[in-house]
């Protein structure tokens, strides 16, 4: 018989039940006659506290709350990819069929299509010994992704006593029957459930060794993130957080993208849907949506579901990691998630900490980011979850609690700068405030897969940009004319780096995504120009003479003029620089 409780008090999304209802912490409950989905978040002094994931307007004291004896969970099986869910894994397409354009309260739909038949290849046979994570079946979920159904992590070693034949099955039909060590049997289907707040177990965590290549030069070259890494993208209004995440979602070399729209504008999720349904994945040649799952919990959706959406997304990512895939999560934005925590904390009358955020903000953020990593799974495969979280500090103030606490738990910080964005320099990631702690870990990969000179070139580029920053302090006061020519040259080369390398056009066919070899080639050309120009300056040539030639502007435009698939053209540019060098020498003696 279901456990029940009676509503005693209501405070926005938080409701109180009087007496001992027999509920457990984190248990999923149905609230009121419309069966609104809720979660038990507090048990004390004969009072049960429940947060409701839907609008509570119209609820009244005396109505019934029914327990389910299960934690808030997601259904894991074929059909997740190429789908769009709300914060508690309800498919928005199915909800639209039932309730139209606006989500009705208490709408009940299956998370995944339970009627659809999938072509299944069974990978175990009778008598096989299986353990947690063992792959029991494979299904072609989309053109790009093979879905691997696994023994749940909470089942220890067992024996297969019955295995279905290859064929068509829905996600709930039993395909394998196991005999457990205690003699009981357990039927397994294509789908399984897992609580969203509990990380899926793994065998071993690997140190970072491979970069998540995004095709964005400032990220891949200056501030790389590793597969299984964590990054924060903080920035004020209009600095390009969402656009940066869209670019990473489109072009990163992850196998699967989980895009969580957490408390942001609905039209941004619409843009992702529209773009990804047309874009072709350069790796597979198939549609981007064939490797993407969207979780839409926009700013006008209930605040409690916003808090849950982050955990829903990371649980889906861990499931695909267990199959051996590299998964990247885009969380846009963790600030809205933290605001949801703050609102719920206020409703619960908890003691506020800095700026009204709850005292446990740091532990909640760490619990989220710690679920990233490159792992050896229980079944022996290797997979990764990379988390890239946007942060929206009010007024672009990076000293506020969400940004500061996030910096403690991420190893990559891509700080967006308002002045760069207003100057139309995109991505507006500032090279002086950003950093990556993965560079040392990834150096062996760069040396082996790109060039032994890659990291030294990158360090030289950063040194020039730092010198420019120091010189600009003087230039702002007394102008650049008073500088010696070697410093004028540093400013000119830094301009070439900023405009020709760091600035990137997301709407240009050649520039939207740039392979690592081209990024290295561009660095080499810029530094070769610097080397030759410095040799001329050391011979007494003024920078004004060097600028009479258009070579600096030509090098800035190589990002457009050199196709991504024809890097041989870099040799021509090197010859042009040599010609420029010899011409200046002849002309000026």
Regions found by a protein language model. Name each.
Residues 45-48, 70, 156-160, 234, ...:
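Metallocofactor- and cofactor-centric catalytic cores in central/energy metabolism, strongly enriched
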Residues 13-18, 49-54, 114-125, 159-164, ...:
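Short alpha-helix capping/helix-loop boundary micro-motifs
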Residues 540-589:
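C-terminal amphipathic alpha-helical interaction region
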Residues 221-222, 228-554:
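P-loop NTPase catalytic core
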Residues 42-48, 78-89, 145-166, 185-200:
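Short, compositionally biased
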Residues 20, 34, 70-71, 89, ...:
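Short, surface-exposed secondary-structure boundary micro-motifs
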Residues 1-104:
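N-terminal accessory targeting/assembly segments
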Residues 97-153, 170-229, 244-247, 282-301, ...:
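P-loop NTPase nucleotide-binding/switch module
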